[in-house]
Amino acid sequence: MNYLEIAGALIGLLYLWFEYRASIWLWPVSVIMPAIYIVVYYQVGLYADSVISIYYLLAGIYGWWMWLRHTPDKGEKPVSGTPSKLLLPMFVVLLVVFVLIGILLKTYTDSTVPWWDSLTTSLSIIAMWMLAHKYVEQWLVWLVVDIVSCGIYIYKDLYFTSFLYGLYTVIAFFGYLKWKQLMNLSYERV
């Protein structure tokens, strides 16, 4: 039994609760959780997931800063939709990162799931950036990441983590609905 994995999964549940509520407290937790998973993923040969956890840790600091940088007179950054002008650049970044990571994993590691690992990693980079900007559609990207990750983690015998990502899948659906509602409320106030 991997106690580090269990600790990471429990902290992940706390993170999920804060993210669902659009609470700024998701960010400190999003620094602790990936620090644990850097080790967990490396131990089972999910190298891209281990590296993406470093990104999550840094993105947690960035997201925290992004959410805090609004002045008191402006209030908290509102939930909004992803601007359409960003869709093509996001897709290009996704594609380039997916191919590069996939090639690196296939060529230089013993990963048994290089392309799946690359897919979840590249989608996660996009989703985390969208979360830092409070774009509601980040939940849809996480939905795909969570479904694919569930299968990967079962395959790798990370059952607690797979269970966590199963919960993430359900919460991603409801999180999208909740944030959509928050976005509509912020538009009504304007």
Task: Tell what function each PLM region has.
Residues 1-22, 26, 70-71, 80-190:
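Polytopic alpha-helical membrane-helix bundles and their juxtamembrane interface segments
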Residues 7, 49-58, 165:
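Individual alpha-helical transmembrane segments in multi-pass integral membrane proteins
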Residues 15, 48, 63-66, 160:
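Short, flexible micro-motifs
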Residues 22-25, 37-52:
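Helix-loop junctions on the outward
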Residues 28-31:
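Core catalytic region of metal-dependent phosphoesterases/phosphodiesterases
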Residues 33-44, 96-103:
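Membrane-embedded alpha-helical segments in integral membrane proteins
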Residues 55-72:
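Membrane-water interface of transmembrane alpha-helices
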Residues 74-76:
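Membrane-helix interface linkers and caps
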